[in-house]
Amino acid sequence: MKKKIVPINPLKADEILAVSHLSCVFNSKTNNPIKVIDDFSYTFQKNQIYCIIGDSGSGKSTLVNHFNGLIKPNQGDIWVKDIYIGAKQRKIKNFKKLRKTISIVFQFPEYQLFKDTVEKDIMFGPVALGQSKYDARQKAAYYLEMMGLKYPFLERNPFELSGGQKRRVAIAGILAIEPEILIFDEPTAGLDPEGEREMMQLIKTAKQQQRTVFMITHQMENVLEVADVVLVLAKGKLVKAASPYEVFMDQTFLEKTTIVLPPVIQVIKDLIAINAHFNKLIELQPKNLEQLASAINKTIANHG
């Protein structure tokens, strides 16, 4: 049998994930194939927050589901650290290692709970991936408290908790695996404003802990708040990859999209239209309304 040749790993020391010419077609063997990902290529740096945006059906969730092997590519290559995922593979080697490296927090993760205690639910992933029950139990307590729930919750039945508490338990279970890459798919769906703020803080904390984070979202104010890089998808194609300000201030590009600007950016554009001195705000790059107010005061003070 002819041995299949694995491509050379292209990743450099500061890179964690590379995608080369990835394509995905659903219903490929029918008369109505649907191309969901169209020749996507990008190399992702370590310890960055990447926000993936685009219209519904643009391929965002399908893309990230390739990263941890949930969907097999029809064409192209993916490297997650030293783990290779390719279209010609029958199965992924080191699949358990891949699961330890990259985890997805799906939309409404609370619906994934199934054990009779919170502790067992959080322990499930780490134990399944080879950790001892002792270590998993310690991590269950640690990550549950990180999510704002105290030790007594470990013995509670997850189905007796509120919706917000269930979501915290589900996320604690994923954090307990301690993956290097975290993917959040619409993490603020169904949350109140306080819950949104807590989720954004969790994502910032993940970066502070040297993790690489992906976030799929339609909430542009959250993109501005946390993203290092924004990737814009349209009909399965990568049409732009840049910083939030480079994306949101590119009027020529925006005119071709349905992106709704975050309030901070809209205010900046309105102020620039009144007085060119406010172009200074683009350099200061405020990420939220509080920072914007401070930046406006600073700009006014400097220009009288």
UniProtKB/Swiss-Prot annotation:
Keywords from the named record: ATP-binding, Cell membrane, Membrane, Nucleotide-binding, Translocase, Transport
Family from the record: Belongs to the ABC transporter superfamily. Energy-coupling factor EcfA family.
Assembly with partners or alone: Forms a stable energy-coupling factor (ECF) transporter complex composed of 2 membrane-embedded substrate-binding proteins (S component), 2 ATP-binding proteins (A component) and 2 transmembrane proteins (T component).
Gene Ontology MF terms: ATP binding; ATP hydrolysis activity; ATPase-coupled transmembrane transporter activity
Major site of localization recorded for this protein: membrane
Annotated ATP binding sites: G54, D55, S56, G57, S58, G59, K60, S61
Sequence ranges assigned to domain ABC transporter in this UniProt record: 11-260
Chain ranges passing through the membrane: none
Subcellular location as annotated: Cell membrane
Reported function: ATP-binding (A) component of a common energy-coupling factor (ECF) ABC-transporter complex. Unlike classic ABC transporters this ECF transporter provides the energy necessary to transport a number of different substrates.
Pfam families: ABC_tran (PF00005)
InterPro entries (alphabetical): AAA+_ATPase, ABC_transporter-like_ATP-bd, ABC_transporter-like_CS, ABC_transpr_CbiO/EcfA_su, ECF_ABC_transporter_ATP-bd, EcfA2, P-loop_NTPase
Record GO cellular component, one term: ATP-binding cassette (ABC) transporter complex
Bilayer disposition of the protein: Peripheral membrane protein
EC number: 7.-.-.-
Statement: the UniProt record of this protein carries the keyword Transferase: no
Name of the gene this protein is made from: ecfA2
Top-tier EC class: translocase
Protein name: Energy-coupling factor transporter ATP-binding protein EcfA2
Organism per entry: Mycoplasma genitalium (strain ATCC 33530 / DSM 19775 / NCTC 10195 / G37) (Mycoplasmoides genitalium)
